[in-house]
Amino acid sequence: MKRTMLYLSLLAVSCSVSAAKYPVLTESSPEKAGFNVERLNQMDRWISQQVDAGYPGVNLLIIKDNQIVYRKAWGAAKKYDGSVLMEQPVKATTGTLYDLASNTKMYATNFALQKLMSEGKLHPDDRIAKYIPGFADSPNDTIKGKNTLRISDLLHHSGGFPADPQYPNKAVAGALYSQDKGQTLEMIKRTPLEYQPGSKHIYSDVDYMLLGFIVESVIGQPLDRYVEESIYRPLGLTHTVFNPLLKGFKPQQIAATELNGNTRDGVIHFPNIRTSTLWGQVHDEKAFYSMGGVSGHAGLFSNTGDIAVLMQTMLNGGGYGDVQLFSAETVKMFTTSSKEDATFGLGWRVNGNATMTPTFGTLASPQTYGHTGWTGTVTVIDPVNHMAIVMLSNKPHSPVADPQKNPNMFESGQLPIATYGWVVDQVYAALKQK
């Protein structure tokens, strides 16, 4: 009921308020923003050491009080060709595009949902079946609940779906196998629930794949076209896209990821699997093979400058410059902790307890929210300190440490920088040690 009343409030605001003038980002220096420069220099040297130790490439940007106060790139956008180190790596620059992985959930799908809910086109308590015909329990389902599943259940990752059905891998997915977007929706409808909806939180890509389909059902166009034309373009963003190679970008502008396609250095095989270095295509298997590169859970590419504008839009309460995407009430609704688990908002992860230290560190305010991405991306938005941090990297662009033991552990993932919270803590420590 509380969520519903808040929704009605935000809808009333969105209907009565015309486009407002919101703060826009300007450039400043760490000193003027109150940061201890030597502490930031120590962080800089440490990141350089991590790159020297094998971490591929990193971009870091810091916002404080509506100003970009720090922006830097380290390492390589591409340094491997297959498993062979390149003699002349492609350097990472502050403009390099990175595969955002699960940060797509926030900066594409959540932004779309926040906008549509502000416009009254969606409600968090709407049932999924309202937008996805045929989404229902079947007589043979052991666990039922699809008939009453709501949008908010998916946003809370409490919808009952498994974490990763691996639809494109026939040997794993079995009868749910799909490498076609239309067929994938049918497979999602058939995917058995693993627990009673609302009884727990299990982070699942399926939740956001389904939310992406819901957005497309409401707007009547592909998700990528909607967010690029209705969200990013009005904000002046030109480097935030799905399928960048199909939209005018060159590989040299983009950070590469896995060395040998999706094979984890040769131990994984399924129909049509990519085997050469991934450069400009989404790494995520479900997004690439099952969804054509455009999905609600993964597929978005961006750089730190564009992400900075999107984070500032959240700090501003839903707008940027003369553009209002959604209301402050919408932001509050989406970033308020769930009663069942303080670390989950509506999609956004919240700094609700110590389990979020690997993401938010130990110094961010409890109201801080953001998200991570499997490729090595993290965004941190702190409304109390009016600060935001984005770190983009291409963590999978390194050999797998032991493909037989753990095909998902890359050598770079064993380095301390792969725990984002350490970098986040250094930023906060620099602010507190003026």
Give residue spans per PLM region:
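Short, conserved catalytic-motif segment at the N-terminal edge
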Residues: 28-98, 121, 400-409
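Short, surface-exposed beta-strand/loop micro-motifs that present aromatic residues
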Residues: 368, 375-388
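Short, surface-exposed loop or secondary-structure junction motifs
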Residues: 23, 78, 139-366
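Sec-dependent N-terminal signal peptides
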Residues: 4-13
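Active-site SXXK
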Residues: 41, 47-48, 66, 98-128, ...
